Regions:
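Contiguous, well-folded functional domains in the mature portion of proteins
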Residues: 35-330
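Low-complexity, charge- and small-residue-enriched intrinsically disordered regions
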Residues: 18-22, 100
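N-terminal non-cleavable signal-anchor helices
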Residues: 19, 32-34
Length: 330
């Protein structure tokens, strides 16, 4: 049985299933063994495991062949993702919902029950109150979303290595002055997959800046693409600054990806609260990057160990992921 046969079978469920798993591997560590990719995961209980995805083999062929890269040049244009987002926002797209659930079984008991008006409406569904409690100890920093987390130390030269690919914070933010503020700090890279909850919250209480939008294209943020393209300095992204009293100035960024129709943030300048909903992603896997300045936070050791060894750690929205150094001193 050929890879082509596997791909044809997988496309039988519909095109969203291909992007579902391909986006489901954003930013994670990979090892190539006889043409297969092993995605490395960990949980907060000390368990580690590896998975191999068919879609990663598909993307490997797409990104690593001449014909495939010609296709990629078309797919990454913003109009393709806008078109896909428009299609998935139409009422007619509702028929895709049961197909998605067939391929991605979920516990629906925690959802707010209502009739979905489109596939994107389903994708951005709300959870019932209490389903994602926020860590009560304000001396702890929290995850903004359900995700697979990698913690990246930022060097004194502003370099942050995401998987095997080094990025400068200046490239990420398109601002040398702002980038200097995060040298020696930490970057928390949260990879959302299609089966994650795609609403996200503010990580801290403080005065929020306006939203800074950096236009770009829409590569998948799968690690195969990350090996070949500097996706985090090319993809469309949006960020804000949160000036806090106990964690410095925190930068929270949303990164778009292939087939993400749009990033929806609710507020411009405002005073915001930790745990308050910030926004949501339309269809597709995507990424949230949170940057902390030098000496402000200390990530939990298990997250540092897992990230060092190439494992992404599964976390949920509101979960504690580290300590605020200022609170620890008190």
């Amino acid at each position: 049985r050929s890879i082509a046969d596997d791909i044809r079978q997988h496309f039988g469920l519909c095109f969203i299933h291909v992007f579902s798993k391909s986006q489901a591997q954003n930013n994670s560590e990979n090892i190539y063994v006889k043409g297969r990719e092993h995605m490395k995961y960990a949980d907060r209980y000390g368990n580690r495991w590896e998975e191999t995805g068919l879609q990663d083999r598909f993307l490997e062929k797409l990104y690593k062949s001449v014909p495939g890269r010609a296709v990629v040049k078309v797919l990454v244009h913003p109009w393709v993702s806008r078109m896909g987002g428009w299609i998935l926002s139409q009422k007619a797209s509702c028929w895709l919902i049961p197909l998605f659930l067939k391929g991605h079984p979920m516990d629906e008991s925690g959802w707010v029950k209502r009739r979905f008006t489109s596939y994107n409406d389903f994708f951005m569904r709300k959870l019932k109150p209490g389903q994602r409690p926020v860590e009560e100890d304000t001396a702890r920093i929290i995850s903004p979303c359900d995700a697979k987390l990698t913690v990246c130390p930022i060097t004194e030269y502003g370099i942050m290595k995401i998987k095997h690919t080094p990025y400068t914070v200046r490239e990420l933010l398109k601002s040398e002055k702002l980038a200097r503020a995060y040298e020696g700090g930490y970057g928390f890279v949260y990879r959302l997959t299609v089966d994650d909850y795609h609403r996200y919250i503010y990580t801290e209480t403080g005065k929020k800046s306006g939203n800074y939008k950096i236009p770009g294209i829409f590569h998948t943020v799968n690690p195969i693409a990350n090996d070949l393209e500097p996706i985090y300095k090319e993809n469309t992204r949006e960020f804000c600054l949160i000036r806090t009293t106990d964690a410095g100035t925190v930068l929270q960024m949303e990164v778009g990806a292939l087939m993400v129709g749009k990033i929806e943030n609710d507020q411009e300048e405002a005073f915001v609260h930790r745990g308050e909903e910030k926004g949501r992603f339309a269809f597709g896997g995507s990424t949230i990057v949170v940057l902390y300045q030098r000496g402000q936070v200390q990530p939990d050791q298990d997250l540092l160990d897992n990230s060092r060894d190439g494992y992404e750690t599964k976390v949920i929205q509101g979960e504690a992921v580290g300590d605020k150094v200022e609170k620890c001193r008190k």
